[in-house]
């Protein structure tokens, strides 16, 4: 996962204009500012007056992966942090990172880290 917030747009990607890179960065900021919120690509595209396809291309070009994969990785990283540093329940962690279905959250988490959320927490020595 790349963090390009400190890179000038002109250096972030040579294939896109400064405006296109700026749109991608602004989209990244929107989708990661509150992980509980869901922002459909078509809605974001309309907000920036570009097509959904263009928006997805800008994002992939700047961040190296599509919006949904990027967001899933950010959500899982935040979930791992919460599991390791708080005593929130797995259900609360799932909700904090945008999953209303705890089972789906646990499945995605295990696929990402190779451990269930509770196993991960135990491995970080914070079991209740």
Where are these regions (language model features)?
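Active-site pocket scaffolds in enzymes
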Residues: 83, 95-96
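A short, Lys/Arg-enriched amphipathic alpha-helix from helix-turn-helix/homeodomain DNA-binding modules
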Residues: 10-39, 45, 72-88
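Short, basic, alpha-helical segments at the C-terminal edge of helix-turn-helix-like DNA-binding modules
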Residues: 71-80, 119-128
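Residue-level recognition of oxygen-bearing side chains
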Residues: 88-89, 104
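Hydrophobic positions on the alpha-helical face of helix-turn-helix-like DNA-binding modules
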Residues: 90-94
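An amphipathic alpha-helical interaction segment
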Residues: 1-13
